[in-house]
Amino acid sequence: MIRKEIVLPAARDEVWAALTDPRQLEEWFANDVELDLRPGGEARFSWGNGESRTAIVTEVEPEERLAFEWDEEGEVEFTLDDDVEGTRLTVVETSPAWTTALALQASALALA
């Protein structure tokens, strides 16, 4: 699991739009975005290097919480909270690949 929090100097509705509006996502995340913003909806992301990924939207609580399931590779959850400086965005990504990668790193460090 990876967890990251950042306080953004923007109102919650602006941060929500940056996470859910395909045109805004294309400005900072992927070159091409299609998003059916409802539980069970599909999200498709494509990048300029030819890579693409598909996710299924699992949770939508407008301006509060958004969650995706990446194929069968894991989940990512975005949570928005008010902060005196704007909006706190918390991103949590869980994936079996992270568990394996971190275990391998721990083993390598133990051997060093």
Where are these regions (language model features)?
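Hydrophobic-ligand binding "helix-grip"
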Residues: 34-39, 44-96
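Aromatic-glycine hotspot motif
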Residues: 1-13, 77, 82-92, 106-107
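A conserved amphipathic terminal alpha-helix motif
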Residues: 94-112
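Hydrophobic ligand-binding cavity/cleft-lining segments
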Residues: 1-34
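Generic macromolecular interface patches on structured domains
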Residues: 25, 35, 67, 108-111
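Tryptophan-centric aromatic hotspots in well-structured domains and transmembrane helices
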Residues: 16-19, 28-29, 70, 97-102
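Residues at helix-coil transition
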Residues: 20-21, 30, 62, 107-111
